[in-house]
Each structure stands twice: as C-alpha cells, then as structure tokens.
Amino acid sequence: RLVGSEMCIRDRHIQDYLSANCFGDYVSRGGLDAKVRELLTFSMLLTLGGCEPQLRGHIQGNLNVGNDKRTLLAVVTQLLPYAGYPRTLNAIACLNEAIPENE
C-alpha cells in the first residue's frame, strides 16, 4: 500500500491514480538518476512539513537506491535555515526511527 493502512478499499481509485501518476510518470522520466530523484523528493517532503508518513517512505526509498543516513542527514542540515527547526527535527526523528544509530 502506498499510503499506509489507513487507506480504505473504497479509496482504491486514489491508490490507482497515485500509482499511475506519481510512481509511473514522474519516476520514469529521464534527466535525473534514482539517487538524485529520491534526494529531491526527501528534501521537498521535509520542507513541506506534515508529511512524516511519506517522508518515512522516501527515507526507505533513498536507502533502496543507495543513499545512506549520512547523506540524508547532510540534506537535512543543508535545509535547516530554509525549512526551520521544527521540520528539521521532525525529519531527524524520522531518520533515527528508520535507521537506528547502531546501523
């Protein structure tokens, strides 16, 4: 499931739209490799705020394409003056939840 267990079966059309549009059109476009695309998505979700479930998903997406916690933390640090402390701290909490310190 793309958006978690809270999505009901009656919302299947939304799931289908997300799959076709976001995970089809945008991901399959050229110009950016998967690592850069995931870093940009992570950056945008971080700065939007209130997107922690999606942020967690794209933390995993970043790990899947070869970006590591150190790289993600560097992105968070770079965005601190633009996104602010609350969103930065939320992103760090998501990172630490997804990738514990001992990993």
Label the model's feature ranges.
Residues 34-39, 95-98:
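Membrane-interacting alpha-helical segments
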Residues 26-29:
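Short, recurring structural edge motifs at helix starts
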Residues 36-46, 55, 72-79:
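Short, structured motif recognition centered on aromatic/hydrophobic residues
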Residues 49-74, 86-100:
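Extended intrinsically disordered, low-complexity coil regions enriched in Ser, Thr, Gly, Ala
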Residues 15-20:
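Short helix/strand-capping turn motifs
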